[in-house]
Amino acid sequence: MSDTEITFSSGDVTLHGSVRVPVSMRGAVPGVLLLAGSGPTDRNGDSALLPGSIGTLRHLADVLERRGFASLRYDKLGSGVTGLGPYEVEDVADLGFSTFIDAASAALDFLGSRRGVNADRLYVVGHSEGALIALTLAQDNPRIRGIGLLEPLAVRLLDLLTAQIDAQLDAVVIAQKLPVQIADELRLALTGAVESLRADGTLSDNLPEPLRNAGLVPANAKALAEEDALDPRMLAAQIDGDLPVLSSASTKDIQIRIEDVDALDDALVHTRLTKLRMTHTNHVLKDIGTQQSTGADYVADLPFSEEFTTGFEAWLKSL
């Protein structure tokens, strides 16, 4: 079935997206809102930062259609046809992470209003950062009947960023490509940046270049501080106990840590939790076999992971 192009509004922004509603002889079908990961990632899961097709969310829509679920995926602000909407580049600093949460909530409303979609059976499936938004939407929200957390952001954002930068610094020091003293100076500057964001939501404009390249610039400060304030484990602990939840993680994912997702699962133990653990799947849910993920494999012409797809379909069947 082909996608139907749609638009919906959130605040001053008109968001562009795609809806699929399978034809069913049994009446209205359940609907799933698909939420993309971080950065300029569009409705299909493709990123403006990576040349080539990734297609993660498009694949999820295909699987959902096979299982009789409607889906909505959209170009979030800063991506795809939506672009920056009514904003100029200089306006970005005034936009917080709540902008993306509000858009997801509006998308859920829109999906529930579509003809052929059962508004009493709405689900949210988020990939990476999208999982954090799914957890946020699920707080005291009886409209949502289940959530999928796929390769999720499982710790506070700045904790993850710190761990990632620490690992990168360790690697270049071991390879003798960076003096220990400079690495220590970068770590000290990073600690100060995190403390500033958590204290008053600001960032210095003279941080070292490697930290600025990692996104630690004043224009991103508000969004970073707002997102970091959302602790995935605290949100998970507050979810209704009867909610079906899928949590997926792979040992080949270089953007998350299995132990972090395990800790998130501990906070979800009171829910109807399904854990999906994988060994051949990269962050964008492609099968990389026994090779190591480098990030270049995200846009490689690889099949989507059968170990993921089989587990995802089994979870959908249980709903």
Task: State where each predicted segment sits.
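Primarily recognizes the serine-hydrolase "nucleophile elbow" in alpha/beta-hydrolase
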Residues: 106, 110-116, 120-169
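Catalytic active-site module of serine/aspartate enzymes centered on a nucleophile-bearing elbow/loop
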Residues: 284, 290-319
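N-terminal cap/lid segment of alpha/beta-hydrolase-fold proteins
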Residues: 1-27
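Short beta-strand/loop motif that positions the catalytic acidic residue
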Residues: 247-249
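Accessory cap/linker subdomain of secreted extracellular hydrolases
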Residues: 148-238
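Alpha/beta-hydrolase active-site loop
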Residues: 92-114
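Short, surface-exposed "cap/lid" segments of acyl-processing enzymes
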Residues: 24-28, 32-63
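Conserved alpha/beta-hydrolase "acid-adjacent" motif
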Residues: 254-260
